[in-house]
Design a protein with these regions (language model features):
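Loop/helix-junction capping segments adjacent to catalytic residues or to phosphate/diphosphate-binding pockets
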Residues: 10-13, 41-45, 110-114
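Thiol-/selenol-based redox modules, centered on thioredoxin-like
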Residues: 86-126
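Sec/Tat-exported extracytoplasmic proteins
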Residues: 5, 13, 24-28, 55-56, ...
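Structural microenvironment flanking redox-active thiols in thiol-disulfide oxidoreductases
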Residues: 15-74
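Structural micro-motif
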Residues: 60-61, 72, 78-94
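Short active-site neighborhood of thiol/selenol oxidoreductases, capturing the structured segment around
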Residues: 1-20
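Hydrophobic beta-strand anchors of alpha/beta hydrolase catalytic cores
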Residues: 1-2, 33, 93
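Solvent-exposed coil/turn segments that connect beta secondary-structure elements
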Residues: 6-7, 36-41, 57, 68-69, ...
């Protein structure tokens, strides 16, 4: 499970983290869940830890942090273009298969824990 978040977000990002955590709960076991920062200027290890702790996802979702230059290839690989100076991004989940291929994408408003867990189970069977 890959999604894009920032730690100072008050709207969609907490909901996305809850959806990912709920999918892991529904699945019954953890699979790699990664949140890639879209706010490298403000996201730090401490803020990522606090954000994930508040979402009860610490240790279950892993935050990828770095500089704009370091994160840019990841954003491009998933067709995410964070806007600066205000941070705006598309709320989206991407499921990646065992070989590292992007297989299923969900707009954030269409993703539910049940739907993500269902499709994760399908990918695990492959």
């Amino acid at each position: 499970v890959v999604t894009f978040l920032y730690t100072h977000c008050r709207n969609t990002c907490p909901a996305q983290a809850q959806t990912a955590r709920g999918a892991l709960d529904d699945l019954g076991h953890d699979v790699p869940a990664i949140a890639i920062s879209v706010d490298p200027a403000r996201d730090t290890r401490a803020s990522a830890r606090a954000f994930l702790s508040k979402q009860h996802a610490l240790g279950r979702i892993h935050f990828v942090l770095g500089t704009f230059k370091q994160l840019d290839p990841l954003w491009k690989g998933f067709a995410i273009l964070p806007q600066r100076p205000t941070v705006e991004h598309i709320a989206r989940f991407t499921l990646v298969d065992k070989r590292g291929f992007q297989r299923i994408g969900f707009p954030g408003d269409q993703a539910t824990p049940e739907r993500l867990a269902h499709d994760l189970k399908l990918l695990e069977r492959e």
